[in-house]
Swiss-Prot record:
Taxonomic classification: Bacteria, Bacillati, Bacillota, Bacilli, Lactobacillales
Gene Ontology MF terms in the entry: 6-phospho-beta-galactosidase activity; beta-glucosidase activity
Family: Belongs to the glycosyl hydrolase 1 family.
Name of the protein in question: 6-phospho-beta-galactosidase 1
Positions annotated as active site in the UniProt record: 164 (proton donor), 378 (nucleophile)
Annotated organism of origin: Streptococcus pneumoniae serotype 4 (strain ATCC BAA-334 / TIGR4)
Amino acid sequence: MENLQVKALPKEFLLGTATAAYQVEGATRVDGKGINMWDVYLQENSPFLPDPASDFYYRYEEDIALAAEHGLQALRLSISWVRIFPDIDGDANVLAVHYYHRVFQSCLKHNVIPFVSLHHFDSPQKMLETGDWLNRENIDRFIRYARFCFQEFTEVKHWFTINELMSLAAGQYIGGQFPPNHHFQLSEAIQANHNMLLAHALAVLEFHQLGIEGKVGCIHALKPGYPIDGQKENILAAKRYDVYNNKFLLDGTFLGYYSEDTLFHLNQILEANNSSFIIEDGDLEIMKRAAPLNTMFGMNYYRSEFIREYKGENRQEFNSTGIKGQSSFKLNALGEFVKKPGIPTTDWDWNIYPQGLFDMLLRIKEEYPQHPVIYLTENGTALKEVKPEGENDIIDDSKRIRYIEQHLHKVLEARDRGVNIQGYFIWSLQDQFSWANGYNKRYGLFFVDYETQKRYIKKSALWVKGLKRN
């Protein structure tokens, strides 16, 4: 890796951090909260439970103050749907409404701008039982929830509708790490993505019809796919992977339809896996109307993939332990993930490749010139860390600093090349519960002792605090 240092940021560039309600709040049975899909699934299938997680439900003031004290100007967080509507068809929960008002007011008091997601991997259990995003009736339920939040939380000026559509659908219907734990159901995964893109479009239209002040968009986790070499079949496999993971979503968001090229390659993948998806009459009309009304876009980036052609039985191994070499991914007619010599990986087998971030930002600029302002809404790396011996000891996470610096450098380089990107959010503010890894996968700028809930400062937080402004 090149030797570089980021010492200063543009004056108007936002530096923030990110969380998600279910991963940090805890308090899963408090103040009338309803049941979401993880409450049931984890109780039945996991040794890890998300209570108290990082205890953010009670410690939000402390955590937001820590963010402000260390130079973070924005906080990405999400609202728990089942706190607001314990019964998704019932009345709003006043206690939850008051709670989120307090959280947002705390952000504003500390001069931390709240960027709020409505859905972050946490559908209500009743929604899951009725098909989750595969059931179009649940789109109507989501719009009801979105409308309520848009109108109620007027202190929020930055709204994201749905977080990481493909990550959610792939976790539910390809890898099976997320409820309902289905495997290699391509029809379900692609249909869920299309329906979420439609739900996002309807929420954007609702936002503007209501005359809400602020910005609105969605968040995609984009992962560039590179052929492992110059062989024609591997180039084609990388192309198909890109369509599946990136272009399908970007077309639907910024164009409001799927290009001929996208549909051609997507159909090749679907046909090879005896799968299909349905675009109903009127869907693309709605998506086209909404596309130019996106006023911001959230991009999450952690890794790129190197692809080799694969034709055979679908297989995926998920690394849930942090022991290198346990993960694999092989999807018929899409490709196989392979390691490229010289590219480092995390303990969870994620490639560390900052150039992929730069390439994707430039690509969005070139292929979707109508795109709105971009925020890198998640970027960070997980480490295995232990509680320090002294009460005031600083945890040395130099590897995290290096990771952040490399990626932030690429963001600023892309910005210099004309990409309209105006912020960078580190995942995550504090250590938190991981959906499929429990508590040993630590991303935070602040270490959480889960037994006492004490926060310890990491070196990365001090590094962030030391960044200057041009």
